[in-house]
């Protein structure tokens, strides 16, 4: 192959498909260090709702970009791109293989491709008007507005993530071009010798796993975790737009019952999983591996390892 670019492994897939466990086993086999590809695991104190890996689950494998910000801090795709590219260099300099694991498609895409962010498309007045519209009409109203104007961007952004929805609308408003057009107009050259692995699963099985995961989160203390943030008056922040937090904030605000909030959380998680799969299938050259039970995990791990080793000529 004689590819002189830095090798990077990327493991993607929808929430609850089993990325965490497999990533640890692969990292050990590949002598890799893991970089989080999840937009919400960067926040401290948001562990249960983001299904953040525990130190015990890491089994000694170094992890990066987890617990680096307070919930009040903002964090952009450009910030992620810069941090991860630096981490990739650091890991490679240690003689290790960088591995990105997560499900935030736009974040991962921004790292892999020669994509630069522009600050030109800024209109604070428009942004403020959209924020007021979100507060008045609700997040779904704004997301529907984006879906009508830029379906591709809407598919990649969760309705709860008002900040990113407004940013996509702002780009359209100021430049006359969709976020998708901006991406397409830029060079789409891969900056790395990247092997993209995707985990998928039968939809009914995946949805059942998502429902079970939410139940387990509630049993593990998600409600008090969110209450701690609520009591600290952490509001109007990017972090609280995460699935699992916004739904329970509505409960603490007295707008919905707890059972309705949990049901909404399950529904939003299932919809997000569907959008994740759509994004990765349409936007990136991913090799997919089916994880639908019953599956021999040891055999599946060997199959994926062999694929990676072949691509990177290990």
UniProtKB/Swiss-Prot annotation:
Protein name as catalogued: tRNA dimethylallyltransferase
Chain spans, region Interaction with substrate tRNA: 38-41
Site (described: Interaction with substrate tRNA): 104, 127
GO molecular function, one term: tRNA dimethylallyltransferase activity
Documented EC number(s): 2.5.1.75
GO BP terms, alphabetized: tRNA modification
Alphabetical list of Pfam families matching this protein: IPPT
Residues that coordinate or bind substrate: 15-20
Catalytic activity: adenosine(37) in tRNA + dimethylallyl diphosphate = N(6)-dimethylallyladenosine(37) in tRNA + diphosphate
Family annotation (InterPro entries): Dimethylallyltransferase, IPT, P-loop_NTPase
Top-rank taxon, per record: Bacteria
Function: Catalyzes the transfer of a dimethylallyl group onto the adenine at position 37 in tRNAs that read codons beginning with uridine, leading to the formation of N6-(dimethylallyl)adenosine (i(6)A).
Subunit structure: Monomer.
Top EC class, one word: transferase
Ligand binding (ATP): 13-20
PANTHER family registered for this protein in UniProt: TRNA DIMETHYLALLYLTRANSFERASE
């Amino acid at each position: 192959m004689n590819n002189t670019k830095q090798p990077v492994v990327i493991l993607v897939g929808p929430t609850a498909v089993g990325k965490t466990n497999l990533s640890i086993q692969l990292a050990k086999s590949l002598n890799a260090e893991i970089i989080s590809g999840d937009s919400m695991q960067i926040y401290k104190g948001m562990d249960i709702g983001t299904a953040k890996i525990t130190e015990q689950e890491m089994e000694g494998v170094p992890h990066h970009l987890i617990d680096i910000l307070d919930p009040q801090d903002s964090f952009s795709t450009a910030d992620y791109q810069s941090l991860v590219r630096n981490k990739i260099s650091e890991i490679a300099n240690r003689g290790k293989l960088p591995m990105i694991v997560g499900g935030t498609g736009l974040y991962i895409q921004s790292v892999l491709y020669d994509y630069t962010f522009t600050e030109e498309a800024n209109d604070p007045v428009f942004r403020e008007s959209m924020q007021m519209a979100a507060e008045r009409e609700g997040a779904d109203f704004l997301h529907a507005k984006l879906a009508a104007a830029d379906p591709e961007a809407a598919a990649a952004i969760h309705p709860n993530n008002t900040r990113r929805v407004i940013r996509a609308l702002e780009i359209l408003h100021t430049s006359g071009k969709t976020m998708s057009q901006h991406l397409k107009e830029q060079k789409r050259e891969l900056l790395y010798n990247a092997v993209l692995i995707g985990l998928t699963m039968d939809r009914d099985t995946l949805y059942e796993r998502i429902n079970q995961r939410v139940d387990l989160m509630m049993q593990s203390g998600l409600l008090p975790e969110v209450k701690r943030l609520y009591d600290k008056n952490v509001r109007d922040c990017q972090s609280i737009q995460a699935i699992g937090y916004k739904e329970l904030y509505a409960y603490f605000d007295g707008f919905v019952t707890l059972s309705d909030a949990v049901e909404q959380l399950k529904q939003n998680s299932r919809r997000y999983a569907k959008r994740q799969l759509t994004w990765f299938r349409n936007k990136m050259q991913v090799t997919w591996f089916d994880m639908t039970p019953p599956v021999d995990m040891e055999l599946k791990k060997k199959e994926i390892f062999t694929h990676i080793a072949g691509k990177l000529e290990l």
